[in-house]
Regions:
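Active-site neighborhood of HAD-like aspartate-dependent phosphohydrolases
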Residues: 51-101
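Asp-based, Mg2+/Mn2+-dependent phosphohydrolase catalytic module
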Residues: 2-18, 30-35, 51, 181-182, ...
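N-terminal twin-arginine translocation
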Residues: 19-26, 37-52
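Hydrophobic alpha-helical core bundles mediating ligand binding, dimerization, or RNAP-core interactions
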Residues: 75, 79-83, 99-103, 124, ...
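Substrate-recognition element of Asp-dependent hydrolases with the DxDx(T/V) motif
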Residues: 142-191, 199-202
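A metal-dependent, Asp-based hydrolase signature
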Residues: 87, 96-146
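Conserved SAM-binding loop
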Residues: 68, 177, 231-232
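Generic structural signal for small/hydrophobic residues in well-ordered secondary structure
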Residues: 63-66, 128, 176
Length: 288
C-alpha cells in the first residue's frame, strides 16, 4: 500500500482521480447519446423524410385487431390446436365470433363506470369464462384456459402487413393505437414480427377508443399536433372518432376480417383522407 507524506501529494492524487472520473463520465454520456440515437433513429430523422414534408404527416397510428392482424383465423387456429390435444368437438369459427362479439359490450361496462378500468386481457378472460360453459369446455384446466386467453397475444398478421409497415417505417414513425393493453400488443409484435417504433394503447389514457382522449394521449406522447398524425384503421367508426379529434385518417379495406362467409362491405370512398386496399397500397399513396 502506498503512503503519502504530504497533503500536497494527496491533493495531487485526488485531482488526477477526479480528472480520470470526469473523462469516463463524459465518454459514458457520449456513448449513451449515440445509443439513444441508434435506438430511436426516426425521432431525429423523420422531419427530413420527403414523404413527411410532402404530406405534413410525421407519424402513423394503427388500429390493430382486424386492421393489422387477422384475429379470427388466429383464434380458430389456436382452438383447433387445443382440440387436437384435448379431443374437443367445437365449432371454432362460432367460438371466435362469440368471443369477439363480447368485446364491445365488455368495454361498454368500463365506459359506463359499471366496471373500473379493466384491461383487455381481463375483459377477454371474463368473456372466455362464459364461453367455457357455453361451449362445453369445462374440463379445461386453469392453465389451459389462461393459455387460450393469451391467444390474443399470438395473433398472425395479414399477408401485406409486415412488408407494408416496413415501407411506411422508412418515411414515418409507426405505432399502435389499440384498445389492447400494452403487454398484449408487445407480445403480439414479437410473435408476428411487427416493426413498431412505439406501442401506444388506450390503457395509457385509461379510456377506450373511440373516446377522443385515447387518440390525443398518443398524439401528446409523440409531441406532435393531431394534424401531423394519421390514424390507420379498417373500421370507419374508429376513423370518424380520430377525425373528430383532429387526426388525419386512412381507411384500409379488410374484407375477410369476419371470414369468407361474411365479406365486409367497403366503406364509401371519399369520407377519409386516404383509402387503401392494403398497407402496401397505403405506402404507395404516401410515397413510401
Amino acid at each position: 500500500m502506498r503512503h503519502f507524506d504530504t497533503k500536497d501529494e494527496v491533493s495531487a492524487l485526488d485531482a488526477e482521480a477526479i480528472g480520470r472520473f470526469d473523462q469516463r463520465r463524459k465518454a459514458m454520456q457520449l456513448m449513451g447519446l449515440y445509443s439513444l440515437m441508434a435506438a430511436f433513429p426516426l425521432l431525429g430523422a423523420e422531419t427530413d423524410s420527403s414523404s413527411s414534408q410532402r404530406t405534413g404527416i410525421r407519424a402513423l397510428l394503427f388500429d390493430v385487431f382486424g386492421t393489422v392482424v387477422d384475429w379470427r383465423s388466429s383464434i380458430i387456429r389456436e382452438g383447433r390446436l387445443l382440440a387436437q390435444q384435448k379431443n374437443l368437438q367445437v365449432d371454432w369459427g362460432e367460438f371466435a365470433d362469440s368471443w369477439r362479439a363480447g368485446y364491445g359490450p365488455a368495454m361498454n361496462k368500463v365506459r359506463s363506470g359499471e366496471l373500473p378500468w379493466t384491461d383487455i386481457d381481463d375483459l377477454h378472460r371474463m368473456i372466455l369464462d362464459d364461453l367455457v360453459i357455453e361451449f362445453g369446455l369445462d374440463d379445461l384446466s386453469e392453465a389451459e384456459i389462461d393459455h387460450l386467453n393469451r391467444a390474443w397475444h399470438r395473433l398472425s398478421a395479414w399477408p401485406d402487413t409486415v412488408g407494408g409497415l416496413n415501407r411506411l417505417k422508412s418515411q414515418f414513425i409507426i405505432a399502435t393505437l389499440s384498445n389492447g393493453n400494452v403487454s398484449l400488443l408487445t407480445n403480439m409484435a414479437k410473435h408476428a414480427g411487427l416493426p413498431w417504433d412505439a406501442v401506444f394503447s388506450a390503457e395509457l389514457a385509461q379510456h377506450y377508443k373511440p373516446d377522443q382522449r385515447a387518440y390525443l394521449k398518443a398524439v401528446d406522447l409523440l409531441n406532435l399536433q393531431p394534424a401531423q398524425v394519421l390514424m390507420v384503421a379498417a373500421h370507419p367508426g374508429d376513423l370518424r372518432a380520430a377525425a373528430q379529434a383532429g387526426l388525419k385518417t386512412a381507411y384500409v379495406y379488410r374484407p375477410l376480417e369476419w371470414g369468407e362467409g361474411r365479406i365486409r362491405e367497403r366503406n364509401a370512398a371519399g369520407e377519409f383522407d386516404f383509402d387503401a386496399d392494403s398497407f402496401l397500397d397505403l405506402a404507395r399513396q404516401l410515397g413510401a
